[in-house]
């Protein structure tokens, strides 16, 4: 598969790496470097070993920003083990990549270009692709779902849907998200309201092109449940196909819930 990946237009480097031990017999994992605009971006690709191809492709969009919350092999393998060819990006400027991430600005192209690449890999089905985003990756997913019809269905894990709420509410004595958002977006909501609206899917839910499932925990203090409720309301008012699942007591990680099974069931309901 390394040679196959290297022959794929847009991939600059592909190296097989060892997956986490629990996935050694289930997933073949690769570290990749790919072209996105004028940037070279780092990422991972995972292929299932126990399922025959061609496989449906899945783009996983990581959370965090810069080196915080960087993409780890475990999440690629978690989805790949179920029969998906999973592609994930660190976004530009991170983990050795070039350029500068913009927290939902031009770096959304890193997701779109990864779709281009995934659909060119011979063992990946060509009819469309699935997408999943966690936290900040939810914002990236919403943005992609408003511009790319190749996405068949998407799942949002504790996803950022309102950048104004995120700016106002995600800060405590140890960590202040406001400075990160100012650094990456270029200013505060008061200084750059258009840029914050651009990163807030609640402001343009009518533009969403893709059936969505939104998974949210009630005890999430990073991306508070209000964001999911607002997005659910906005999608309903826009007449968009979607489903909201609330996990009582779950935090930002959604650990201990059925969120992965729920997302995969949603994909099964929307076959390629």
Outline where the language-model segments fall.
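N-terminal cap/lid segment of alpha/beta-hydrolase-fold proteins
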Residues: 8-51
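Short substrate-entry loop that stabilizes the transition state in hydrolases
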Residues: 51-55, 60-99, 164
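Alpha/beta-hydrolase active-site loop
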Residues: 102-122
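Alpha/beta-hydrolase fold nucleophile elbow
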Residues: 124-135
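Hydrolase active-site cap/lid region
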Residues: 142-192
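Short beta-strand/loop motif that positions the catalytic acidic residue
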Residues: 208, 214-216, 220
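Acidic catalytic loop of the alpha/beta-hydrolase fold
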Residues: 219-223, 253
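C-terminal catalytic histidine-bearing segment of alpha/beta-hydrolase fold enzymes
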Residues: 229-272
């Amino acid at each position: 598969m390394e040679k196959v990946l290297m022959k794929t237009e847009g991939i600059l480097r592909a190296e097989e790496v060892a997956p986490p031990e629990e996935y050694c017999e289930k997933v073949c994992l690769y570290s990749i470097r790919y072209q996105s605009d004028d940037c070279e971006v780092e990422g991972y690709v995972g292929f299932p070993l126990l399922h025959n191809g061609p496989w449906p492709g899945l783009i996983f969009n990581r959370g965090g920003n810069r080196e915080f919350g960087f993409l780890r092999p475990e999440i690629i393998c978690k989805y790949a083990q179920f029969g998906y060819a999973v592609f994930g990006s660190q976004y530009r400027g991170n983990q050795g990549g070039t350029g500068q991430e913009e927290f939902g600005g031009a770096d959304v192209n890193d997701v779109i270009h990864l779709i281009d690449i995934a659909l060119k890999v011979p063992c990946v089905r060509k009819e469309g692709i699935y997408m999943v985003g966690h936290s900040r990756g939810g914002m990236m997913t919403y943005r992609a779902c408003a511009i790319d019809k190749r996405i068949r269905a998407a799942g949002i894990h504790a996803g950022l849907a309102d950048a104004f709420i995120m700016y106002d509410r995600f800060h405590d004595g140890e960590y202040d998200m406001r400075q990160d958002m100012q650094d990456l977006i270029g200013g505060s909501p008061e200084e750059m309201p258009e840029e914050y609206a651009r990163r807030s899917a609640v402001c343009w839910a009518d533009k969403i092109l893709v059936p969505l499932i939104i998974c949210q925990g009630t005890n999430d203090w990073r991306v508070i449940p209000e964001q999911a409720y607002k997005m659910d309301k906005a999608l309903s008012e826009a007449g968009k196909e979607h489903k909201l699942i609330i996990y009582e007591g779950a935090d930002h990680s959604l650990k201990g819930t059925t969120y992965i099974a729920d997302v995969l069931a949603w994909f099964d309901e929307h076959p390629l």
